[in-house]
């Protein structure tokens, strides 16, 4: 029984895999996937920041709603990260990488009302939803595009729920 090579080939940035997709398609998909991993990690942490620190009208409903959003966001980021590795890449998921590379605006830590948090969340959910929708058409790997489409559907729904609670 032979084992897979766990080294990069001399001519490639990728780890060896028997996946025969062409290298450029893999590299482009990995780059797009890592961008989403970074954004989704940031969005999951932002969601938890709001979840912990909000106060006011509709607290419990929004507090519990955000838990469900975060669970789905983490599931998507895990799917993206695993796809990166399937293609021979390295998933970039450390806090240091996220801090350095997130395109999201820093989340304010000095807000407390449910309404302030909903507005701040809507801005960031909207940014990620718009970015992933664009990424769907930019990747040549149909499996990656399908993953992005599934995440886009969830983000659009979450954004709708958030915006529906803004007074």
Swiss-Prot record:
TM regions (residue ranges): none
CDD domains referenced in this protein's UniProt entry, alphabetically: DPS
SUPFAM superfamilies, alphabetized: Ferritin-like (SSF47240)
GO molecular function, one term: ferric iron binding
Matches recorded under InterPro entries: DPS_DNA-bd, DPS_DNA-bd_CS, Dps_gammaproteobac, Ferritin-like, Ferritin-like_SF, Ferritin_DPS_dom
A GO term from the CC aspect: cytoplasm
Catalytic activity: 2 Fe(2+) + H2O2 + 2 H(+) = 2 Fe(3+) + 2 H2O
GO process annotations (BP): chromosome condensation; intracellular iron ion homeostasis
Amino-acid positions noted as binding Fe cation in the UniProt annotation, renumbered to this chain: 51, 78, 82
EC number: 1.16.-.-
Keywords: Cytoplasm, DNA condensation, DNA-binding, Iron, Iron storage, Metal-binding, Oxidoreductase
Primary location class: cytoplasm
Location in the cell: Cytoplasm
HAMAP family: Dps
Subunit structure as annotated in this protein's UniProt entry: Homododecamer. The 12 subunits form a hollow sphere into which the mineral iron core of up to 500 Fe(3+) can be deposited.
Family recorded in the similarity comment: Belongs to the Dps family.
Function per UniProt: During stationary phase, binds the chromosome non-specifically, forming a highly ordered and stable dps-DNA co-crystal within which chromosomal DNA is condensed and protected from diverse damages. It protects DNA from oxidative damage by sequestering intracellular Fe(2+) ion and storing it in the form of Fe(3+) oxyhydroxide mineral, which can be released after reduction. One hydrogen peroxide oxidizes two Fe(2+) ions, which prevents hydroxyl radical production by the Fenton reaction.
Name of the protein described by the UniProt record: DNA protection during starvation protein
Organism encoding this protein: Serratia proteamaculans (strain 568)
């Amino acid at each position: 029984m032979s084992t897979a090579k766990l080294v990069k080939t001399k001519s490639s940035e990728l780890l060896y895999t028997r996946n025969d997709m062409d290298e450029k398609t893999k590299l482009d998909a990995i780059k797009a996937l890592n961008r989403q991993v970074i954004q989704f990690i940031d969005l999951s942490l932002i969601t938890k920041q709001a979840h912990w620190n909000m106060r006011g009208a509709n607290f419990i409903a929004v507090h519990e709603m955000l838990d469900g959003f975060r669970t789905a966001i983490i599931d998507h980021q895990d799917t993206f990260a695993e796809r990166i590795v399937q293609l021979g890449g390295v998933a970039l998921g450390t806090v240091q990488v996220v801090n350095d590379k997130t395109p999201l605006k820093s989340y304010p830590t000095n807000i407390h009302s449910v309404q302030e948090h909903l507005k701040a969340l809507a801005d960031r959910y909207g940014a990620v939803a718009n970015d992933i929708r664009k990424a769907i058409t930019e990747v040549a790997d149909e499996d990656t595009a399908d993953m992005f489409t599934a995440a886009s559907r969830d983000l659009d729904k979450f954004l709708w729920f958030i915006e529906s609670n803004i007074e």
